[in-house]
Amino acid sequence: MSDFYKTVKGVSQGIYREKMSRFLAFAEPVSSVEEARAVIKRYANEYHDARHCCWAYMIGTERNEYLSSDNGEPSGTAGKPILGQINSFELTNIVIVVIRYFGGIKLGTSGLIVAYREAAKLAIEAGEILECHEQARLSFTFPYLSMNDVMKVVKKSDLKVIEQAFDNVCSMTIEADADKVPALREQFAGIDGTSIIS
């Protein structure tokens, strides 16, 4: 398992033209299959007058959750070339949607493959590629009297607090780079009265 992965920073767009057909490509970061599907649906609705809305996505640091669609184009001429660009750039947590406006001239199988590949590539290159750390969460409980010690670790390590509850027995869930969680687990476990939940 890798602690790092590459994705795009935000939405980026590329436009490829071939024989009067226009290919509008959009690359967008996503964190789940559901989010990718929502993005695909949004573009399909927005560009409902287009001939085709082809797409591919890759999810997860292991890059093992992926899918692509030719959306009516000949099999293997759209979705696979889009997915191929995701693989070429070694990206994950990304969806690329390519909208085709047909220009009246057929491109043939090889022409379609080139067009969808180039459109996807242009969308990726138009954006910024980020190298991100895989994130993990750590949940624990602690007595209220240990609050200062817990907060010192949180501030010193610049941790993102996801959830917290304060009472006689307090609870907290933090998020950090996955490779730092084992050391943080030890730090929090060393604070008097602290119990690690997960």
Regions found by a protein language model. Give the residues of each.
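Short amphipathic alpha-helix segments
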Residues: F140-L159
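Active-site beta-strand/loop microenvironment that shapes enzyme catalytic pockets
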Residues: A78-E125
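Conserved short beta-strand edge segments in small beta-sheet-based binding/regulatory domains
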Residues: K160-A165, I191-S198
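Short glycine-/aliphatic-rich beta-strand segments at the starts of folded cytosolic domains
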Residues: E128-Y144, M172-I174
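C-terminal regulatory domains involved in ligand/effector binding and gene-expression control
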Residues: M1-G76, E163, G190
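Short amphipathic alpha-helices in soluble, non-transmembrane regions
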Residues: V150-K156, A183-D192
